[in-house]
Amino acid sequence: MAAPADRLPPAPVDRDWPMTPGYVARATAGRAILRDDPHRPRYHACPPVGWMNDPNGVIQHGGRWHLFYQHNPRASVHADMHWGYMSSPDLVHWDDHACALRPEDGTYDAQGIWSGNAVVADDGEIGRAHV
């Protein structure tokens, strides 16, 4: 079972996605475009940037809702799939958190984190299983 989200190390910078000043400028501009888009959902969990689809773990724990979902945090394309993570006290106001799971070179999930689920384990921690 994967480690609880708050115990995960920061996401590594992938060799194919260097954090160059140009990349940061494009990501910042992209956030402004999304913020001002009249068609962007206002009452729907949405990451600040990147691709989102397939909620794979929605649970209530500790007085909050926790949502895990397929997410490409670096581009708006269906690739480089991570598990994004958001939480909410009321299913209307969402807090975005660091990715809960990310692909790692040399492992079975190197091609992406796809389907799975989240559960509250016997020790009270949030656990995730994925394929």
Enumerate the language-model features and the residues they cover:
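Carbohydrate-active catalytic/glycan-binding domains of CAZyme proteins
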Residues: M1-H130
